[in-house]
Amino acid sequence: MKLGVFTATLQNLPLGEALDVVQALGVESVDFSTGGCGTKAHCDPEALLTDPARLDRFREEVLGRGLEISALCFYGNPLHPDRDVALVHRRELRNTILLAE
């Protein structure tokens, strides 16, 4: 089993600094929140999917520290009773799945 850190707990830090903390803890992997009710501070799937250079930099930030991505965590409700919220959550869930491919 590998230990990892859910980076949303470090959302007040820029991505690089958050990953430095994770690396200093000696863990091997990171989980990223990707939207819904969670933060997209470190991993915004829509932004990463529409900008290949940004996606490459994101990967390098993680892999360059010897870390791996163990999970993309979407916390939302695509069946939310408020249609506007449901549509946003559906889009964010879809983008999370596409990013995971």
Where are these regions (language model features)?
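N-terminal pre-domain/capping segments
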Residues: M1-E101
